Amino acid sequence: MTRRFTMTPNSRNPVKTPVSGMKVAPFPRHSIATEEVRRRDMRVVREKGYRQQCVDGILRFLVENGYDGQVSQKILHNPSSKDFQSIFKFLYGFVDDFTFSSRFEDEVVNVMKNLKYPYCGEITKSQLSAITPHTWPVILSMCSWLVDLISHGTSLLQQEEERSVESCFFEYVCDGYMRFMEGDEDDTALEEEFERRVTEIYTGIFKEIDRKKEELRRIEEMISEARKMSEGREELDRKKRELTDDLNMLIASEKQLEGKKRKYLGAISRLSEEIVKVEEEIESLRAQEDGLRAQITKQRINPEDVKEMNAEKIELFKELERMKPEKESLMKVVGEQEREAQERAEEVEKLFFDLKGLRDEISLRIVKDGKGVPRVANEVSGEVFSGMSGVIVRLEEELNSKSDVLVTAEMNKSILEEARGEKESITSELNSRLGYYSDKLVMAGKLYLEKKEISENEQRKSKTEMELLENELLKLNLESNTSLLMSEQKLQKARIVLDRTLNSINYEREEINKMIFGFYNAAMDIHASIQSQVGDLRALLNK
């Protein structure tokens, strides 16, 4: 039965196990508690070198034994009250399974007194309740002393375990010798007791060796099964690696495309705005076109009518050209007749003037006889000139005929002028309509040219954008190929690291096998030496 190494009573709580997984390693107290003797502390606890030594020892012990709290050089140089309580409870767990209550400061002082800490008089409750840089060196020295105590107790237990076989053997020899001196030569029970004690000592070791062998065999079986499974999974692993590489490449490409995506989205937004503006302009032009179309549809004249009117215009022009010679000839005739009539009128006026002058002297006047025939007679003398009356009548008749011809020519002239005016008005109207339709055709041609230019500009822009996108696609292809090469290089490096790891694992397994085999051989050698010594003792006893 394991002995307890403190004066504190046994606790009914279950055995406390530290974080490292080791069981509580109690060790015996080889002294009886007496009254505390206050002694002077010869240590320089506030010296920087001594404090660093204590911190290093505590930190190494906590790390080696699996302390699960936060620990570092900085924390151990200036800890909080919570850090100190956690560290002290962990350290004291290697001594006893005592559970601390809310009166932590009182219990720490009591347990340190029970452990016979030589400088326990310097530890006070106020120092333990509020850890300050001034009081911490004393408490740090106490924790370092507790770590040294635990390490010393552990080494003593190990030494006792190492000496247990030799002590059993010497006890067996002494007991056999004492019984031999007393005359009891029956050492069967003594040998059985010795074998039982030695078996108890090595049973745990042999069980641990068997357990390690079984575990090693199980691990080898698992490795062989894993290898068998890995042979069938190589293809899946290869596909997995390929998919992983593709995924990594896609992720890298996606990261690279994010910036370009934002840039293209901005360009698309700008193009969308421009497209909206162009569409608005197109809508306005369409509205104008619809208005023009509506205006054209409302008109009665269509392009065929324009062609007919143009043909009619040409015919009219031709007719005018044909009428020009007739007009000129008529104008010449009219001019000649007017000139002739003017000359006749001038002659008649001259004659009348002459006659008037003569009439003043002669006093001639035209009279009619009883038959109504006009005759020229002198008023003064009453003389009748029968010859002159015929000439005068003939001249008057000729004058009247010429006057009639002149009136007829004037009428023809007015008719021709009216016809010419009508033709000119029709021609001007046709010219105005022709100009209107020409303007409409020019406007439609300009609109067509503008639309054509807009469409050509859009095609050029689209072509430029397509070329830019093709260039970006080529760049992405090159980048993806580069990423693929880099991924393959990383895969090769990972394979090399995996091979090295497998080699190191195989090497460690071989070393473990060698150590187990050496330990097994050493145990067998010890067992053989013990058997030989037992045989020698039996031979001595038989003598």
From Swiss-Prot:
Bias type Polar residues, positions: 1-14
Coiled-coil regions listed in the entry: 203-356, 450-483
Keyword Cell cycle: yes
Keywords: Cell cycle, Cell division, Centromere, Chromosome, Coiled coil, Kinetochore, Mitosis, Nucleus
GO CC annotations on file: Ndc80 complex; nucleus
Record localization: Nucleus; Chromosome, Centromere, Kinetochore
Keyword Hydrolase listed: no
Domain of life per record: Eukaryota
GO molecular-function terms, A-Z: microtubule binding
Region (Disordered): 1-20
GO biological process, alphabetically ordered: cell division; mitotic sister chromatid biorientation
The protein's assembly and partners: Component of the NDC80 complex, which consists of at least NDC80 and NUF2.
Role noted for this protein: Acts as a component of the essential kinetochore-associated NDC80 complex, which is required for chromosome segregation and spindle checkpoint activity.
Family: Belongs to the NDC80/HEC1 family.
Listed name of the protein: Probable kinetochore protein NDC80
Lineage of source species: Eukaryota, Fungi, Fungi incertae sedis, Microsporidia, Unikaryonidae
